[in-house]
Amino acid sequence: MAASRSPHIRLLHIRDEINGVTDAIKGVSFEDYRESYALRRVSERALQIISEAARALPVELTGKYPAAPWNAIIGIGNILRHEYQHLDDRRLWEIVTVHLPQLRGVVLQMLSDIGDA
């Protein structure tokens, strides 16, 4: 198995994207986010990467961590790629500010369980 396809590497990608987008929006209001093309695109790209990395994780692994909404995580990538015209800034803001920090906790636990936090 190539290193870039390993679950460990995919989890690191998810963790790093969550950290990056969280840092990018730290201290930003929803109104400022909505008005900032750059912040919206940073958030969308991070979600695409997170979604793709989650899609590549084995079901045997994700099944052990039902606290994360894996199907929704994978599904947001499809929306970002194929139904981008229907994006809702408020919903993306909620995902980035509420749900990604929760996912980060699950991902850190997964990394710890497989031997790398």
Give a label for each model feature.
Residues M1-A117:
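Solvent-exposed interaction patches of small proteins and small membrane subunits
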